[in-house]
Amino acid sequence: MRRRARSIRFSSDDNEDNEEDDDYYSNAHSEKSEDHSNHIKVSHFDPSSYKQKLVSVRETQRNRKFSSLQKHLNTETPSFSVSIENPSKPSAAFNDASLGKKSTEHQIDGIRNGSSNLQMEGNDKELDTDNNEDESTTFKDEEDDLISPKSYLTSSKTFSYPKAPTESTNGDYLDEDYVDGQSDPESSNASDSDFADSPDDLTKVRSPIPSRRGRRKRKMRGPILPVKKNLRVKKAMSPLRAERNSPDFRRKLRSRDNRPNYHLFDYYNEIASSPNPSTTKITYNPPKLPMKDFATLPIGYQSTCDSDETSELSSTSSEQTSDVEGLNAYNNLGASSDIENAPSSQLHFGHIDEKTIRSTDPFANRENLDFNSIGGLEDIILQLKEMVMLPLLYPEVFLHLHITPPRGVLFHGPPGTGKTLMARVLAANCSTKNQKISFFLRKGSDCLSKWVGEAERQLRLLFEEARRVQPSIIFFDEIDGLAPIRSSKQEQTHSSIVSTLLALMDGLDTRGQVVVIGATNRPNDLDPALRRPGRFDREFYFPLPNKQARMKILEINSLHFSPKIPESYLLHLAESTSGYGGADLKALCTEAALNAVRRTFPQIYTSSDKFLIDLNEISVSICDFVVASEKIAVSTRRSDVKPNIPITDSHKILFKKSIEVITSKIRRLLKLDVYLPTVESLQKLPAEELMRQKEINSLKTTMSFRPRLLITDIYGYGCTYLSKVLFSMLDGIHVQSLDISELLMDTTTSPRSLLTKIFSEARKNAPSIIFINNVEKWPSLFSHSFLSMFLLLLDSISPLEPVMLLGFANTNQEKLSSTVRSWFPSHRSEYHDLSFPDYSSRYSFFHYLLKRISFLPIHQKSAEAASVDILPKVLPVSKTSDLTDKVNRRQRKNDKKIKNKIQVKLSSILEMLRSRYKKFKKPIIDLNDIYIDESNERVVKGKSKDNFEYFLSGNTVTRKKDNACFKMMNFEEIERRLWSGRYCTPKEFLRDIKMIKQDAILSGDVNLKHKAKEMFAHAELNVDELIDAKLLYDCCQVSKREKAYKQLKQKKLNNAKDAHEMQESKNEETFVRNDVAQEDNFIELSSNEVRNVSNDEHKHTLFHGQSLTHNNLIAVTPPSRTGVEHKEENKKYDNVNIQKTLAKCAEEFAEHTNFNKVELLDFVYSKLSSTIWENREEHDLLKIVRDVRQTFFRSLEDMGV
């Protein structure tokens, strides 16, 4: 309606009237109280005030003609209301008090011939009240078809017609192109079918609508109602349509004297009495998200609602607003709703297999995805195969026996012991050729959601999908985050998730052939309901690897190292890495390999460019493992397990005898040396023999009675060192530490609860050891109630249970308190008093230190300043060398096509140049005028050297008088280069053409010079026209690849040549060394005589050992090496003397260190180590020995010994 008012207002030429109309329009617009983005509005105004403003307009509109019905009526203009609440029923009605008594036929003619402001939507006619029969018809209180505010609520249109006019209006104003009785097809096509009734409905109503006369109706619509064309209603185009659409057609606007009156009436009562319109409901069914995109999400699109029903959008506004809302709804909610309601078969749910693992991990290979790649867990692998593979592959066995197979297993243990690795290998190897097993890998956080009920729904869908594709395996990593212990302090959301998981694992509905595996580092934090048969039937404990397991893990991770690491060093490394987990050992091997790369190619760490490196030069040595062991931090430092911190090798040598004695006692008390036959060997026995063997084996559980061991250290003989080294010697025994610092370290946990937890873990993992250090200080540090609780827990252990109490005391047994002595009764406990290391132990202790002097000197500065070889850089285009052979062949084939294309185009250009510029077919300078050196075969006879103006200088020809250099380029040479593949780009072709031009310029011939420039210009022009940008770019890439390929090929040839020469030199040295040993069979020749032997004879001699003239063998006398041999002999003599001197020093130190205190030995040991380090660059080893002896005796003086 705003557009109609604006268009009518702009049609006037009077500025004063325009200002009045603007005032009215602004007032009417400012009174709109509600947003009209979805509904139609009506503006109210005061008729009296408007009457005063538009007096001039009403006075000029007196020549209008009204319909006969309007002339007959003397009352106010009747109101015509059209409701769009139900388009299927007639909604046109007149006010009965305002209707005349004209016949229905006249009314129908008025409807068909006239027009109103209502746009018929979905039909083929429009009514317009602005077009009247005569331009001289006067309006009294005329109003426009603006809508009242009540229509915003009822979605109806109200129209009113002018009051009865005067009879002085008889003139007709006709449009030139107007045909009476014919509606405008353009307006008929642009209809809004969703908001208006059909014209047939209007024919049933007595309506005094004037016939259409006057100006052509302009196609308009309301400011809110969208134009929705009904494709089913189409009429033939009017014959005047084309003329009206022509640019020469000019609309006939209304003049100033026939402008309408914009006076409006209040139709609030009429609109309020009309029925409420029905709601138009629009349901959006957006297309579903492609499942290929959905599969990449963690577990599907997180829904924004809690319901599983499809979201629907409703709108009571226009269709245009609904379209926008529908689009936003699809972006925000529609896709989510479709994904929620998608079938479970289309969801991803973390389904992985060997192919998925390889696609996500580019470094994964077949060997890394095999059970053989897991070391030290052979027993667990066997049980896992029995539990997982047997029910899935052979379900008929359990059906025959009417038993339920175990369908749940829990992995628990310290971090880095192979729990997740086991799941990855199981996912890659669980399926066979005959049986496909699905594997679902989920993490605890994947199933959680901020929406209430969403996590439970995801779990339900996961189990439904696993049941659908059974047999299947579901692996929950870090399951303690998904199913923690339910308590009153916990949120109800987590309790609901745990309850849902419990019901899904073992509820009323069976889950079929679905095996559930959980992994956690904290099994005690899991809900107890999960840890029962039916849910998690078995629990596999992944311990820290023992010595044999560490050896196996190191062998697996260093299998591809070159050269192969010696087995003796791997054994030593396995002994020194006590307390390392599988992940720590793998990180150790990785760090050693990276250190080898850093040592071999330090250039790659100082530049961002890529270099050409030879991978065969990388060699991992023992020194790389030594450096790597200093960088690796062990991750298995847990509060409930005593860390296995190894001591130095020198202290192991010092306490070797004491360690052996204590270890033997522990094994004897816990009966660790008792051999039991394996299960495989027992299965082969008959039933009776098996029962007898079982009865004998049961004796082991009754052989140990409350094992106790107390180790006392009166004079500080090294109790602290022994407490560290013992656990590295007792691999496979679970150790719980009751150290004072560990009991008091955690402020959030009371010592009593920690004490209860330690005893519980020790009894669960029997045979085990409860270790107490500084046991003599417990009565003074802890309260009586705590000590009583400790004694109560100690007595609660079964007498025959293999749980040992091991105590270390820094005093003798008599000085211990009665409380501590009660823990170690004399009749059932073992005692061991530590003694000071004897002479042999002290000698080995000091000799181990002094041996390091023989490794000196170390030139640290020279090593840092050593020169680094320069590596060749890899060109950016050399990535093709890294491609596979198949891709590389395809690339070379495409490059050949591009080169053929450029050759054909350049050959056409060259043919044109040859036909037009024949002077450049041969070189500019005649070959007979060039002097050639006499050593060459081509010598021009009959002329002296001074008679030649040009002479040959390398690859160019030089003129004698001015030393001008000619390239001697010509078309024949260019053609030869073209078809030999020398030109990869047009630039190279133009470069040779330019050489011809340069030679012509140097020749001095003006005509030849101009022709050469013209020829070069033609060549450039033809190259630009025939070769497009894409082909030019492809040619440049081909040229780069060709250069990189040639460089790589040349490098390989050089490397092969160097390797061949090195191998020949080695063969020659080997031949000479082997033959010189048999001097009787050789005729010795000096080095000068050997040089005179011909190459063939010398080569034949080297390979066959025979000369061409002698039948005896020929050998080459090596040069004199008397000086070198003398130095080596002196060095060997010095080493022997140094070793003897060091042994004497060790004996001397062992004799003078009978201190009865290990702490004093450590003091002397540290002083000697400092002295050796300070002299690390000294060449005179005897001087270092003298300084060490002086330091030793000075330390004894400082201690007062």
UniProtKB/Swiss-Prot annotation:
Catalytic activities: ATP + H2O = ADP + phosphate + H(+)
InterPro entries attached to this UniProt entry: AAA+_ATPase (IPR003593), AAA_lid_3 (IPR041569), ATAD2-like (IPR045199), ATPase_AAA_core (IPR003959), ATPase_AAA_CS (IPR003960), P-loop_NTPase (IPR027417)
Keyword Hydrolase: yes
Enzyme Commission number(s) from the entry: 3.6.1.-
Keywords recorded for this protein, A-Z: ATP-binding, Bromodomain, Hydrolase, Nucleotide-binding, Nucleus
Gene Ontology CC: chromatin; nucleus
Compositional bias per record (Basic residues), positions renumbered to this chain: 212-221
Record GO biological process: chromatin remodeling; nucleosome assembly; nucleosome disassembly; transcription initiation-coupled chromatin remodeling
Localization per record: Nucleus
Listed Polar residues bias regions: 66-89
Protein name: ATPase with bromodomain protein abo2
Source species taxonomy: Eukaryota, Fungi, Dikarya, Ascomycota, Taphrinomycotina
Gene this chain is encoded by: abo2
